A protein has these predicted regions:
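Eukaryotic intrinsically disordered, low-complexity regulatory linkers and tails enriched in Ser/Thr/Pro
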Residues: 4, 19, 37-40, 115-116
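Amphipathic, interaction-prone secondary-structure segments
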Residues: 26-56
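Generic structural hydrophobic/aromatic packing signal, biased to beta-strands
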Residues: 10, 29-31, 41, 54, ...
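Helix-rich interaction surfaces within compact, conserved domain-sized segments
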Residues: 62-116
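A generic structural signal for short, non-catalytic loop/turn and secondary-structure boundary residues
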Residues: 22, 34, 47, 68-70, ...
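Negatively charged, low-complexity tracts enriched in Asp/Glu with abundant Ser/Thr
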Residues: 1-33
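Intrinsically disordered, low-complexity boundary segments flanking structured domains
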Residues: 15-18, 42, 60-64
Length: 116
């Protein structure tokens, strides 16, 4: 589906962006126009066939969620200082990429099983 395709590509971009960050920064999304500000990405998902969602929090800690149709998808990644109360930065791209690889691997493993 278009949503799944976009979801997988965004994960690749998130991971690549995070590979360039030092240990004091983590990835966030910036928004153009208005006072929407910056979303510290804590997760993302999709709803077939055509909706992507990002969720997390803003600088004050208030929860935020962006729900976006794939035809209007624009994502601006930004580096933010990691949260002071965390010893390590949140690497959402690495976590989502690992989850994606595990889910693809489990689907392949299920397909390879022979019926008894």
């Amino acid at each position: 589906s278009p949503a799944e395709w976009a979801y997988e590509r965004i994960i690749v971009y998130l991971k690549n962006f995070e590979e360039q960050l030092d240990n004091e920064h983590e990835v966030a999304m910036g928004f153009a126009g208005g006072d929407a500000g910056v979303l510290r990405i804590e997760g993302m998902g999709y709803f077939d066939p055509d909706v992507i969602t990002f969720y997390g929090s803003e600088a004050s800690g208030a929860k935020m969620q962006l729900i976006q149709h794939v035809s209007q998808l624009n994502v601006m990644l930004r580096a933010l200082p990691k949260q002071l109360d965390q010893p390590e930065p949140n690497r959402i791209g690495f976590r989502l990429a690992a989850d994606l690889e595990n889910s693809v691997g489990s689907v392949k493993a299920k397909k390879k099983k022979k019926p008894r």
